[in-house]
């Protein structure tokens, strides 16, 4: 009896230690068409190349394209998890670099816009596999809703992808303001995609940081910028992630730098980071309302 209790305690401690190490990241944009999914995918692959176990979750339900960017046909999507005799193990697929991913689907407006029993089941299924991964990355759809906000409040970090265009910047600021007002402690990282020059990329990042600091009192973390690069469009046509299509391309090098910058920042704040309560927060926000 004592031995069983001791073993149970060890397992609980081990699980808590792992949960402290596992991180949930949500990647989003204020508007569609800024290359968010491409950034999510290639960032995930760059993490894999650095020895991190990653689950990339296509949450752009109804318009998901991670599987298309990978050139893979998925027999199951996230909506299948609610079908009889289908578990999360059935819908997780393996891509290049042994990247685990879950494809989006059609016919479901919002995965959390459903009854409590299904939400509970979804959370339990995701938690079932979470111990295998260092990072769970949610590639979110464009736009905001109250239910999506609850998911964002539960993750550890927010990545906002934008382009230098004024409309994209306006939407990016509106998105970060919405999130900041809901949880001012949530770390927000910004990435400028398709910068036409180094000057444009740097100035766009500086402008976003200054505006957030002045009007929100928010310190943004700059991930960097990805330059406009024909390699990206060529890779999309070939249905191959550009990081693998041409590792020496400017866009590929930028994603590598962005990944290394993020990991270095993670090491720097290792002593300060809060315990991982992602699943506890999901339950709190979705099941205890």
Functional labels for PLM-detected ranges:
Residues 1-31:
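Extreme N-terminal, non-catalytic leader segments
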Residues 216-243, 254-257:
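Beta-strand-loop-alpha "switch" segments that mediate conformational coupling across diverse proteins
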Residues 123, 169-184:
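Conserved C-terminal guanine-recognition region of P-loop GTPase G domains, centered on the G4
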Residues 241-289:
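NTP-binding/hydrolysis catalytic cores, primarily Walker-type P-loop NTPases
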Residues 59-131, 236-238:
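P-loop/Walker-type NTP enzyme "switch/lid" segment
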Residues 30, 163-164, 188-202, 225-232, ...:
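G-domain G4 guanine-recognition motif of GTPases
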Residues 24-88:
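Walker A/P-loop NTP-binding active-site region of P-loop NTPases
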Residues 125-132, 145-167:
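Inter-motif core of Ras-like GTPase G domains
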């Amino acid at each position: 009896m004592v031995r069983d209790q001791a073993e149970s305690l060890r397992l609980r401690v081990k699980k808590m230690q792992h949960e402290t190490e596992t991180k949930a990241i949500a990647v989003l944009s204020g508007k569609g068409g800024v290359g968010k999914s491409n950034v999510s995918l290639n960032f995930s692959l760059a993490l894999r190349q650095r020895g991190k176990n990653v689950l990339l979750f296509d949450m752009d339900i109804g318009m998901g394209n991670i599987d298309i960017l990978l050139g893979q046909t998925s027999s199951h999507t996230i909506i299948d998890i609610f079908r009889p005799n289908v578990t999360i193990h059935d819908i997780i697929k393996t891509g290049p670099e042994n990247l685990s991913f879950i494809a989006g689907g059609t016919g479901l407006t919002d995965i959390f816009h459903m009854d409590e029993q299904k939400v509970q089941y979804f959370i339990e299924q995701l938690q079932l596999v979470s111990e295998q991964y260092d990072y769970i990355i949610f590639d979110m759809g464009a736009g905001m809703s109250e239910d999506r906000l609850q998911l964002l409040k539960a993750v550890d970090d927010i990545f906002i992808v934008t382009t230098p265009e004024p409309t994209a910047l306006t939407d990016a600021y509106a998105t970060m303001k919405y999130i900041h007002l809901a949880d001012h402690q949530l770390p927000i990282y910004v990435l400028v995609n398709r910068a036409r020059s180094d000057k444009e990329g740097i100035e766009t990042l500086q402008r976003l940081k200054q505006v957030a600091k002045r009007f929100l009192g928010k310190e943004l973390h700059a991930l960097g910028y990805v330059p406009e690069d024909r390699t990206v469009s060529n890779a999309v046509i070939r249905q191959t992630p550009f990081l693998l299509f041409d590792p020496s391309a400017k866009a590929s090098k930028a994603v590598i730098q962005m990944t290394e910058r993020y990991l270095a920042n993670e090491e720097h704040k290792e002593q300060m980071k809060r315990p991982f309560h992602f699943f506890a927060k999901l339950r709190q926000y979705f099941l205890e309302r």
